[in-house]
A protein has these predicted regions:
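Mixed-charge, low-complexity intrinsically disordered regions
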Residues: 2-104, 108-180
Length: 180
C-alpha cells in the first residue's frame, strides 16, 4: 500500500541551512508521518518538525499549488533572463528508501531542459543525499520555483499554501512578502 502522505519542506523560504541547524539527525529510515490531530481530517497537513510539513497526496490545495508552480515556470525563466536579483531555487520530488519528499535545490546553472544546482535542504528520508549535493533535475519534474531576495519572494506557491495552512501569527514570523 502506498503511503498517502508526502512531506513538503519549506526551508528555502526561511533561509538555507536553517533546517540543518535545528539538529535534524540523518537516518537511513524515512521520517515517520505523525497521526492526525484528534478530530482533524485524515488528509489535514501535519507538522513533522518546525520546517517540515506532511501533506496528504489527496490535499487538493497543495496539489493545486504544485500545479501552479510547474505551470508558471515560464515566469521563472523570464525573471532569470531579466537578471532579477535573488537566490533561485526549484522544488522537485526526491525519493529514497521508498519515501518521497519534495525538496528545494538552489540553482547553479541550466542545461538543456534541466536545472543544475545544490540541495538546499537536508533530506529527511535517508542518507543517500545531503544538503549541498550537486543535482540535475529535469524541468518536467519541477513542482515549484522561487526567486528570493531578502524578504521578497517570487513564486513559492507551495510555500504560500503551507503558510495559508498555519496560524497567521506563525506565518508572519517568517517576514515573507510574495510578489508576482
Amino acid at each position: 500500500v502506498r503511503n498517502p502522505v508526502l512531506a513538503i519542506v519549506f526551508v528555502a523560504a526561511v533561509g538555507y541551512g536553517f533546517f540543518n541547524a535545528l539538529g535534524h539527525g540523518r537516518s537511513d529510515k524515512p521520517m515517520a508521518i505523525p497521526a492526525a490531530a484528534p478530530g482533524a481530517s485524515q488528509t489535514a497537513p501535519r507538522a513533522m518538525t518546525e520546517n517540515v510539513v506532511a501533506y496528504s497526496t489527496e490535499d487538493k490545495a497543495m496539489q493545486a499549488a504544485k500545479n501552479k508552480g510547474h505551470s508558471t515556470l515560464p515566469r521563472f525563466h523570464e525573471l532569470m533572463a531579466a537578471g532579477t536579483p535573488g537566490t533561485y531555487t526549484v522544488k522537485f520530488p526526491l525519493t529514497q528508501n521508498g519515501a518521497t519528499e519534495h525538496i528545494w535545490m538552489q540553482l547553479t546553472g541550466l542545461g538543456d531542459g534541466t536545472f543544475i544546482g545544490l540541495l538546499a535542504d537536508e533530506p529527511v528520508n535517508g542518507t543517500k543525499y545531503k544538503m549541498g549535493d550537486r543535482m540535475t533535475v529535469a524541468e518536467a519534474d519541477v513542482e515549484d520555483w522561487m526567486v528570493k531576495n531578502g524578504g521578497e519572494v517570487y513564486g513559492g506557491y507551495t510555500v504560500r499554501q503551507a503558510f495559508a495552512d498555519m496560524p497567521k501569527e506563525q506565518a508572519a514570523k517568517y517576514g515573507i512578502t510574495f510578489k508576482d
